[in-house]
Amino acid sequence: DLKKCKQGKDFGRGFYLTSSYEQAKNFVPLSVKKQVNIGSMVEGTTEGVISVFRLHLTSDVNVYTFDSADAAWLHFVTANRRKDLFPNLASQYQKYDIIAGKIANDRTARTLQIYISGGYGEPGSDEADRIAIETLLPNRLENQFCFCNQKAIQTLEFVRGDRCELGSF
């Protein structure tokens, strides 16, 4: 049920995946911690699961890909994280079932917060965009895929769940 997915994520509400197994593995401890905090998992949980999927795209699925962490990507991520910045931008992407691009992770969160709060200048200005992007690029940004609706979810085939010990990180 996509309505249970949290709002305010990089590409909006949806089911998120990555093609990087290592990135998924590194996300497990944070994911488990969040689930413990909301009561979905018990305190003291010692392992998590990496879910592996196969994608079966069909021609009727609309996919948009941000090829790089550029101004368009930055503005879209910002619009999803703070609705009053670039207020009409998020709606321009509603026609897409899957949105792909770089991930703004915990290493980049501070840069995005500074950008959003105007620390680099007015968000959307050439100068603020340039500084934010130059600051983000050295972080070796991985990819992410947001499956925005049920049509997109139906392109996924669950392959397996790999258990991983939380202490093995």
Kindly give the residue locations of the regions a language model identified.
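Conserved NAD+-utilizing ADP-ribose enzyme module
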Residues: C5, K9-D10, K25-N26, L30-F169
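A short, exposed loop/beta-hairpin motif centered on an aromatic-Gly-Thr core
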Residues: D10-Y16
